[in-house]
Amino acid sequence: MAKRLMDEYQDEYEMVRVFANTGCEANETLDFVHACDVEFGFNTVWIEAVVNARGIPTGHKIVTYETAKRSGEPFEEVVEKYGIPNKGYPHCTRELKENPIHSYVRSMGWKKGEYLTAIGIRADEPRRVKRTISTQNKQIRVYPLVDMFPTDKLDVLDFWSEQTFDLQIPEHMGNCKTCFKKSDKKLQQVYQDNWHHFDIFAYLENQYGYVGKNMIKGVHSDKPRQFYRGYRSVRDLIASFDLSEPLPKDDPEAYEGCAASCEAFMGDEESPAWGAEAESD
């Protein structure tokens, strides 16, 4: 998407490409973003969240491929303030990606509601498309791979088959490695690749489980927050894995994948009434 927009619309729009690093992505993801810069000349701006005192929204700082954190530091800073994110408290996207990106854009002098946010959802993912304008930040989302040049997953695979490089990880390792939005199957695949990938989340649960309020099935609870569906901890999740037989490999042409559930930007409807409080500017 970014390549076609740059090639076909650069003269029509002022474009900025931003990568918000959470510190929990696979190293290969960062390598890939850097390779795109080198090969395509994207001049991507790398940023990380800057968590401020209570009452002040999350800001940003500019980093580089070389200085970007790779051991979960930005993620931990968000958890220290807002608590463990999970299905009921999905503030990780808001505080690690959405707010830092909007903070950077504002620093350029762009104002809310006066710029477009291009999102790389494909034409074969219609359920992920959100046409409404966010009431929280007046964000206007556009979907070039749906409306401007309809593109499905096979088209994307064809494009990368013609390039000299690609994202060198399987689908289950996309986004934050142990994201709670991934299916149990994909999380088991992550575990079988390297069980140490879960160390960060296990540490965060132990360290910050009691930060923030907690509700389970709509009822206030004194129990600590935990990451995974069904109110499961990292330990509970791992105990549920059936390791007796190897899982089948991902089909690269399958339309389902972990990326299908991890949104770059939240819609207003995705913020539950009992979610963590968000500061606004």
Residue ranges and their predicted role:
Residues M1-D281:
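Nucleotide-activated chemistry modules centered on ATP-dependent adenylation/adenylyltransferase
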